[in-house]
Structures are given as structure tokens and as C-alpha cells.
Amino acid sequence: MKKNTLLNSELSYVIATLGHTDEITICDAGLPIPDASQRIDLALIQGIPTFIDTVKATLTEMQIEGVIVAEEFKTVSPQMHDELMTLIAAEEAQCSKSITVSYIPHEEFKIHTRESKAIVRTGECTPYANVIFQSGVVF
């Protein structure tokens, strides 16, 4: 469900049409995107837009109840992983709802992206900077 105003019309539309438990993926510039998935390609150059900025913008619009990340993200890119977890904790506090965080192997993560309504590609070049958000409800 949408919460606010997002300038990117494709991303805004996808969020507005999400039902409870539907998923979207926000990924780095290198994650393979399945041909059958809707691709929202925001990448301009390396690092623009960043993964974290894209997550922040998405969270202003999307109510989430679950997060899936690759296990490798914690060990290979711990600083960015911690930034993401800080944003998730802030989102939990703001919406007063629990958000489940699940870790799966990266190869399994890539397969799981096929379930996403859309995959949002950023310009991020940090390894494993990918997240799947599961839509919640605002009530």
C-alpha cells in the first residue's frame, strides 16, 4: 500500500498496486534480473542512485512487514548491511509494527526474486546490496 509521494511513476505505480504479502526487490547494479520480471531501472552511473537512497525513498511509500536479504550481505558488506538494518529498525519504530528479517543464501535469493512484482535496479556497486521487501498493510 502506498503511504506518500514518490516521483518515479513506475515505482510509485508498482507500490500502489501491491497487495498484502506481494514483494518487490531493490538491487545493486549487478544482480541478474529475470526476463519475466518487471524491471524498473534507476541506474544512471556507478553509485547513482545508491541502494540506501532507493530504500529510503521506497520506505516513504511502502508499508513492509518482511525483509529478505542474502546471508553473504552481513559478512561481505557489513557497513551497508548495518545501514539497511538501521533503516528497518526505524521503520518498525515509526509504524509500530514488527518487521521480519530473513536471511537466505545468495543463490536462493536470486531465484526468489522471480516472485517479485518488480525489481528495482540501482547504481549501487557494493556486493550483495539487495533486498526483497514484502508488502504489509497500513491498518
UniProtKB/Swiss-Prot annotation:
It comes from the Bacteria. Pathway: Carbohydrate metabolism; D-ribose degradation; D-ribose 5-phosphate from beta-D-ribopyranose: step 1/2. GO terms for molecular function: D-ribose pyranase activity; intramolecular lyase activity; monosaccharide binding. SUPFAM superfamilies: RbsD-like. It is an enzyme of class 5 (isomerase). The active site is at residue 20. One of its GO terms (biological process) is D-ribose catabolic process. Signal peptide: none annotated. Keywords: Carbohydrate metabolism, Cytoplasm, Isomerase. Substrate binds at residues 28, 106, 128-130. Pfam families: RbsD_FucU. It catalyses: beta-D-ribopyranose = beta-D-ribofuranose. GO terms for cellular component: cytosol. Its main location: cytoplasm. It is found in: Cytoplasm. Homodecamer. Catalyzes the interconversion of beta-pyran and beta-furan forms of D-ribose. Belongs to the RbsD / FucU family. RbsD subfamily. This is D-ribose pyranase. The gene is rbsD.
